[in-house]
Each structure stands twice: as C-alpha cells, then as structure tokens.
Amino acid sequence: MVTVKFKYKGEEKEVDISKIKKVWRVGKMISFTYDDNGKTGRGAVSEKDAPKELLQMLEKSGKK
C-alpha cells in the first residue's frame, strides 16, 4: 500500500494512492484530488517528496 503524506491547511494528512482521482503539476508541486469518504479532498506535495507512483500517475495523465 502506497500512501502520500502531505499538509493541508496546517494539518498533516495521509492518503492511499488508490483513492487519488486526478493529478496535475503546479510549478514544482504536484496537486491532486482524492476520494475522502464520499467527499472530494485536495492535496499537494512537492515534486521531490512525491512517491514515484504519484509521478507515474502524472505522466499517464499527460499534464507535465
């Protein structure tokens, strides 16, 4: 199980990569949306801290 750890509004969060819906790049950050128990959650992680699976999802989406 691969998870992405990130901070959102000052709170440490962790999400399973299988719950991530959409991934895109904003400068040197990787932003994403994920399923948060029926709601849409948002997160971002720096490119250097992103797990390789998240970077692969970004490549597949074609949004470089």
UniProtKB/Swiss-Prot annotation:
Compartments annotated for it: namely: Cytoplasm
Record-linked Pfam families = 7kD_DNA_binding (PF02294)
Q: How does activity depend on temperature?
A: Hyperthermostable.
Q: How does activity depend on pH?
A: Highly stable from pH 0 to pH 12.
Q: Which SUPFAM superfamilies match?
A: Chromo domain-like
Q: Write down the InterPro entries for this protein, in alphabetical order.
A: Chromo-like_dom_sf, DNA-bd_7a-e_arc
> What does UniProt give as GO cellular component?
cytoplasm
Q: Describe the function of this protein.
A: Can constrain negative DNA supercoils. May be involved in maintaining the integrity of the genome at high temperature.
* The protein's name: DNA-binding protein 7
Species of provenance:
Sulfurisphaera tokodaii (strain DSM 16993 / JCM 10545 / NBRC 100140 / 7)
